């Protein structure tokens, strides 16, 4: 099958040849899979076209967790009646997908966004988490399930004392209908199989382009001074105004949490807006998102964690072959959200070098 046909048929002409990386790998059960994985930071980030299984043609498309974007002007005109913002858990994105051969599922494979098969480091973490009945759900519904692997054992930058090593369902892709699942479908799956879901933190109501924060979870609200926010009178005339307000709310919560608990509470919130914008919208506290003061160390650390998630057990061998592999990887990922001049600045490079020398845990 030609690469152009793959791009047109499976990636909706939204990627280019340079965005697809060819792979041939052996799974944990010894199956050989060959195909292409997408590295473009859009809705197809990490998605794969598997061309061959065990050296035989067996075409199948696996949708990954889409790139989660900040607010931008391209979505300003979107009108919606409801937006539910869930907690943005700070961990590793894990995707479970079915591998088919001759019409039968022969293996359910976990991966991270940028890998075909999860690294041994991730497999070892998953052994410490409750993964049942994920494999059974994938097989029964012909579905790709997406989780956040988070908790004290997989702590990145946000301390989460409520979990040791847990999986929370954050997305799903129905292979049968070729569609990313809605919040209601995710909630139904979670309820039926007692899967964890991220906390629902902020509920927004909309009407004809106007938006109002209808409710805030007690998880956040207990840290807010009630006289500084009135949920019934905050009417926003645009998504831009709404997201700016949410940033301030999250910043205030984090400051109060730090004063009381000694640590910040949240990295931000995420809304599943597949129907409205064809993807996910994230909002982070002001102190995390601000770019004009340089790239926050927390953002650089997140990309370093991703590097470990993807290459963990292979880092030493990679470094011997390419000493700049780590820096190039982190810079490439940072460039998706930050201006290239800031990414290439000496300040950013110094932070990356300092973090590289830090212990993994």
Language-model features: locations:
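Core nucleotide-handling region used for phosphoryl-transfer chemistry
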Residues: 1-361
